[in-house]
Amino acid sequence: MHPMLNIAIRAVRKGGNFIIQNYERRKFVKEDVEKNKVFLNNIIYKTNKIISEIIHKSYPYHTILKKHENILVKKNEKNTVWIITELDGKTNFLKYFPYFCVSIAVVVKNKTEISVIYDPIKNDLFTAVKGQGSQLNGYRTRCSAINTLNYSTVAVNPSNKIHNLTSSYFEIYKKLIISGISFRCTGSSILDSAYVAAGKIDCLFDFNLDPNKFVASKLQVREAGCLINNFMGEYEHNNNNYSGNITSSSKFIRLINEKIRECYLI
């Protein structure tokens, strides 16, 4: 096993265990928004501290990306950078909806070498090493081989700025629903991407392209055989927050893009 992968797994499991302890204690009150915010920030801070201590114990000279920093500004960073997402699916956590995760990505010389996504509820560990494929709990994963839109499952991470979306986006949704697609809006795009990599979900539409989250997700899906396109058919687009990405197999993306083109031709 890659030595940094071993440390990443150890760190993400310990961080996930801390989150689960607080999830099961249920100290937060659903109706008290301000108290929940303080409680959640405290959990995130302590989780980051737990994970960071494990990383720095083995790699004291590596950089851990700070919460307010963006990986895009670190593109010329020569040092190894660790990107931690302490809790993806915060609303789910507060609502007792058991769908959230912890993730770590390791970037070496501007290339993502390792990705670890951990679902502490199910104890599912998704790992990926560049050039060595992706795994779920030690077993190799591949993306879905479905070649029809009918009966397919697509996860959606809708835009936080939905008012900026044009009516054409809603026409696309309508067209795809009529084609037989079943949409899911789960609240954790990182875990969705891991499910796409494992073939549990056929495709992911992501309109909230957080670059830091995108790093861990991208390696997982690419190592599982997925492509990442935007809705215009262009490859791997992660800068425009409104265009969104489609993550799936090349065959399924081609089917999606055909339906999208039909919308623009009508």
Curated annotation (Swiss-Prot):
Function: Part of the processive rRNA transcription and antitermination complex (rrnTAC). The complex forms an RNA-chaperone ring around the RNA exit tunnel of RNA polymerase (RNAP). It supports rapid transcription and antitermination of rRNA operons, cotranscriptional rRNA folding, and annealing of distal rRNA regions to allow correct ribosome biogenesis. This subunit may play a central role in organizing the structure.
Superkingdom per UniProt: Bacteria
GO BP of this protein: inositol metabolic process; ribosome biogenesis; signal transduction; transcription antitermination
Entry-linked Pfam families: Inositol_P
Phylogenetic placement of the source organism: Bacteria, Pseudomonadati, Pseudomonadota, Gammaproteobacteria, Enterobacterales
Major location category of this protein: cytoplasm
GO terms assigned for molecular function: inositol monophosphate 1-phosphatase activity; RNA binding
Reactions performed catalytically: a myo-inositol phosphate + H2O = myo-inositol + phosphate
Protein's organism: Buchnera aphidicola subsp. Acyrthosiphon pisum (strain APS) (Acyrthosiphon pisum symbiotic bacterium)
Top-level EC class: hydrolase
Protein family membership: Belongs to the inositol monophosphatase superfamily.
Residues annotated as transmembrane: none
Protein name: Nus factor SuhB
EC assignment: 3.1.3.25
Cofactor: Mg(2+)
Subcellular location: Cytoplasm
Keywords, alphabetical: Chaperone, Cytoplasm, Hydrolase, Ribosome biogenesis, RNA-binding, Transcription, Transcription antitermination, Transcription regulation
Gene of this entry: suhB
UniProt: substrate binding residues: L87, D88, G89, K90
GO terms under cellular component: cytoplasm
Subunit structure: Homodimer. The rRNA transcription and antitermination complex (rrnTAC) consists of RNA polymerase (RNAP), NusA, NusB, NusE (rpsJ), NusG, SubB, ribosomal protein S4, DNA and precursor rRNA; S4 is more flexible than other subunits.
InterPro entries: IMPase, Inositol_monophosphatase-like, Inositol_monophosphatase_SuhB
